[in-house]
A protein has these predicted regions:
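Extracytoplasmic metal-acquisition and chelation regions
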Residues: 24-298
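Bacterial N-terminal signal peptides
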Residues: 3-17
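N-terminal signal peptide c-region/cleavage motif recognized by signal peptidases
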Residues: 19-21
């Protein structure tokens, strides 16, 4: 027969169990690609869970979502996407989900227009590559999270301000290094025209093989145009981004005598053990690669 002490212990345990607070579920956020996911994690801190639809290294423009992507996203409280025609697959993807709230992170950004190809006249979607724009992204992320999780609104806004400070401290030394380069050397030659915002921020003129990865890429006409541009302007280095073939850029380098300056990162982060596992490292590695190639032998 149970003792009085046993009854007392069980009664206390039951009462404590009833009184114990139930941990609130964290806000679940899904982003369309890894760059946005890293930004969102910096804003979220420990207050929200953030995942990306695409994996590190993925080409974002023509991505084809899988049924698994849809299942994972269906559990989200909030979806963050870029807009500006970057995720051409997103509207159909969102249509496969229940009525999920989403936020377009380029809201409030002044776009740079694409000037050639099938997407001529449309906004260049790679707005996160500009410093001032990146600050707008961070603010939009904090606003969206705060709206859907007001209990943690202060946390999101404080984290966002701290992250903005880190970003300014990252980019300013790189901008200063490029400011020493003579005007006629300030060219950025790439495969995709994905660096218009960064080029504007760093005071560089831009030349590229194709305007968007979703367009035709690496055609003989595109290669010839850039070869002529490199020769006419005595450009010293050409680059290519990580998610496409560098063969056309290396052909330009061979035929002009320009150096192949290396890989630039824009559409995707790397895995944790790679060169750009975070957005700040993406900015740093990409900008340093440009600076090092253009200032070599100066």
């Amino acid at each position: 027969m149970p003792s009085l002490l046993t009854h007392s212990i069980l009664s206390v345990a039951f009462a404590v169990g009833l009184a114990a607070p139930v941990a609130a579920e964290k806000l679940k956020v899904v982003t369309t690609f890894t760059v946005l996911a890293d930004m969102a994690r910096n804003v979220a801190g420990d207050a929200a869970e953030v995942v990306s639809v695409t994996k590190p290294g993925a080409e974002i423009h023509g991505y084809q979502p899988t049924p698994r992507d849809i299942v994972r996203a269906s559990d989200a409280d909030l979806i963050l996407w870029n807009g500006m025609n970057l995720e051409l697959w997103f509207e159909q993807f969102l249509g496969n989900l229940r009525d999920l709230p989403s936020a377009t992170l380029t809201d409030g950004i002044e776009p740079i227009s694409i000037v050639e190809g099938s997407y001529q006249g449309l906004p260049n979607p790679h707005a996160w590559m500009g410093l001032d724009n990146a600050l707008i992204y961070i603010g939009n992320i904090a606003d969206a999270m705060a709206a859907h999780d007001p209990d943690n609104a202060v946390t999101y806004r404080e984290n966002a301000e701290a992250y903005k400070t880190q970003m300014r401290e990252t980019i300013e030394p790189l901008r200063a290094a490029l400011s020493e380069l003579p005007e006629d050397k300030r060219w950025l030659v790439t495969c995709e025209g994905a660096f218009s915002y960064l080029a504007k921020d760093l005071g560089l003129k831009e030349l590229y093989l194709w305007p968007m990865n979703a367009d035709q890429v690496g055609t003989p006409q595109q290669v010839r145009k850039v070869i002529d541009g490199v020769r006419d302007n005595d450009i010293k280095a050409v680059f290519c981004e990580s998610t496409v073939s560098d063969a056309p850029a290396k052909q330009v380098a061979r035929e002009t005598g320009a150096a192949y300056g290396g890989v630039l990162y824009v559409d995707s982060l790397s895995t944790a053990d790679g060169p750009v596992p975070t957005y700040l490292e993406l900015l740093t590695v990409t900008s340093e690669t440009i600076v090092n190639a253009l200032t070599k032998d100066e």
